[in-house]
């Protein structure tokens, strides 16, 4: 990254550190499958593992050469001292049905190391899938999967359920009537999952057989605090200082939800057994370029039982550049009226279908109703008989890869690719003794 910063400064020495950071964001792309990846309220894809992705040096230099320096940074801070208890054992499996006994209506659970139900899942019917050691043949769309621990890893069980269409998984122990464990090796599981005791699981499975209308939901019992913000800014960094007294601070999950609905995980379940967090400062970039005005929600969940804590104080600091934004969409009203003639656009939308959100167009000072998509294709040799075709794509578009070997022959379709981002690629075997020609055809949205 430091080398890329040097390249940017080489073509535009007037760039500030904020300019360089935003250039890195604007030129980045996601290259790894990660279920945590979401588009934030400004349309920028982000996950908690690699942030906005890997910057493209060529695009960064191109953007830097015509970059408009950012306005001065403004910081708005908000403080509160709620002094409230953090509910113990906040991970709960909710069970509803006319035959559900009271002790099974709100079951204490443990969880994975990956995706969490920061918002409650849908209340769904469940399918008892037994131990699950191979792919699930039935369609679980619109359902949750009830699975017993054993033989296969947690990660494989959850993946099989996700492949079958399940929205979430409940895994119950196969040994020890009351034990709850954290499900290791599940950092990249594609759907949320809870773990419950053998006693609760065995009883639920029998109840499911008697009551086909039974429904379940993954939820969290958290302490929540709301900050109402009236300042209109384009968001950059966000800082949250948390002052809490908890016996094992690693049990706490701390999240921040922006007015756009984007959730940042500031702290996840871990093995830190110290007290706190005592006046810890957490920062997130997940909300870059979102509007700041509206409701910001802090949630703190105790994800393990038996230890209790108190939330004493919070301080939220929003950093960004002020704009006039009466409709709170992250687009400056004068810019929006100039290009759209009204205030009916949104920052998340891609009005000209060129792969760039209106918020990105505003950042780069390009026209949001005129496509800026420039098709480029690169041919990258991987070894002596394998090539990678890579091209600038539009998200969601389907591309045909055409190939022609030698001269005077009819080109044939080698395959199709549906793009999920601003770049797509295709690997191909070639004969190094023959000439080969390739063409990419954009077939548009399916």
Predicted features and spans:
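Surface beta-strand/loop "capping" patches
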Residues: 67-82, 221-231, 372-394
């Amino acid at each position: 990254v430091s080398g890329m910063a040097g390249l940017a400064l080489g073509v535009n020495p007037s760039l500030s550190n904020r300019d360089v950071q935003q250039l890195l964001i604007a030129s980045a792309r996601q290259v790894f499958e990660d279920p945590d990846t979401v588009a934030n309220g400004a349309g920028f894809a982000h996950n908690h593992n690699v942030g906005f992705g890997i910057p493209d040096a060529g695009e960064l230099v191109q953007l830097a050469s015509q970059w408009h320096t950012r306005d001065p940074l403004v910081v708005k801070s908000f403080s509160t001292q709620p002094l409230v208890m953090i509910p113990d054992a906040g991970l709960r499996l909710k069970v509803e049905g006319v035959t559900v006994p009271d002790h099974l209506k709100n079951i204490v659970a443990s969880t994975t190391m990956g995706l969490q139900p920061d918002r409650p899942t849908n209340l769904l019917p469940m399918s008892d899938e037994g131990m699950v050691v191979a792919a699930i043949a039935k369609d679980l769309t619109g359902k949750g999967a009830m699975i017993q621990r054993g033989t296969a890893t947690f990660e494989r069980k959850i993946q099989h359920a996700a492949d079958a269409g399940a929205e979430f998984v409940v895994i119950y122990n196969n040994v020890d009537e009351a034990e709850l464990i954290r499900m290791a090796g599940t950092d990249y599981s594609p759907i949320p999952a809870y773990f419950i005791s053998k006693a609760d699981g065995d009883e639920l499975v029998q109840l499911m057989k008697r009551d086909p209308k039974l429904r379940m939901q993954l939820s969290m019992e958290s302490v929540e605090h709301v900050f109402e913000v009236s300042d209109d800014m384009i968001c950059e960094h966000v800082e949250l200082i948390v002052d809490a007294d908890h016996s094992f601070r690693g049990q706490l999950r701390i999240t921040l939800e922006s007015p756009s609905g984007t959730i940042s995980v500031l702290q996840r379940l871990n093995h830190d057994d110290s007290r706190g967090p005592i006046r810890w400062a957490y920062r997130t970039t997940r909300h870059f370029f979102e509007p700041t005005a509206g409701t910001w929600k802090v949630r703190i969940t105790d994800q393990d039982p038996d230890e209790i804590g108190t939330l004493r104080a919070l301080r939220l600091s929003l950093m960004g550049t002020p704009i006039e934004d009466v409709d709170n969409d992250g687009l400056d009203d004068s810019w929006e009226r100039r290009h759209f003639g009204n205030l009916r656009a949104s920052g998340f939308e891609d009005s000209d279908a060129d792969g760039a959100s209106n918020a990105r167009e505003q950042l780069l000072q390009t026209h949001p109703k005129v496509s800026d998509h420039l098709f480029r294709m690169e041919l990258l040799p991987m070894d002596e008989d394998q090539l990678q075709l890579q091209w600038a794509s539009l998200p969601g578009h389907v591309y045909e890869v055409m190939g022609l070997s030698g001269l005077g022959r009819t080109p044939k379709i080698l395959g199709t690719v549906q793009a999920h981002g601003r770049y797509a690629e295709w690997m191909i075997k070639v004969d190094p003794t023959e000439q080969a020609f390739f063409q990419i055809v954009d077939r548009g949205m399916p």
